[in-house]
Amino acid sequence: MKTLHVIAAAAAATSLWVVAAESVGKLPPPWFISGDHATSYQAGIDNVETISGKGAKFLRYAQGEDKGFGSLVQVISAQRYLGQRVRFRAMIKTRDVSNWAGLWMQVQAQQRQNAAFYNSSDQPIKGTAAWQARSVTLDVPEDGTTISFGVINAGSGQVWIDQLSFEVVGKIVPVDVMPAARLPEKPVL
């Protein structure tokens, strides 16, 4: 009888492993991993942890020192958005994020590498959090060249994004701005 239980347990574990292996797919191009510790992260499509039913993109800390960050990124031409306000929205979920996670977007221009930037560090998602709606809104200047956007994971843990959208919005929608660093009032010598 014990032998039968052991065989049943082994079969169940094998079945779970097969289901887990089948639930993760490759990350579709043009998405890629970036960041100062990009090689410490893995990314793909998770068909289990999804709310759209189409699979959620994930970014998971896999190895290395628990320092720096990884980011799941897509870069597009700014050409069709010149002079407009754009918003990147997604549902986001985290598990065991050691530092913080959030959506981000950057606009580069001919004369300025960082024409506009926001990374959600002032509205961090930490630890384990259920699905929640987040967005980033920026203006694209007339000389814009590229728009980069995605999700950042600073530290260990895993983050998922699903139900993504990228759209032009009206000027009534406020732009996200990074908080200004407080500068000293006088020099420290």
Which residues fall in each region the model found?
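Positively charged n-region of N-terminal signal peptides that target proteins for export
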Residues: M1-H5
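Hydrophobic transmembrane signal anchors and adjacent membrane-proximal interface regions, especially
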Residues: V6-I7, G170
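Bacterial N-terminal signal peptides
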Residues: I7-W17
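Extracellular and organelle-lumenal recognition/adhesion modules and their flexible linkers in secreted
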Residues: L16-L189
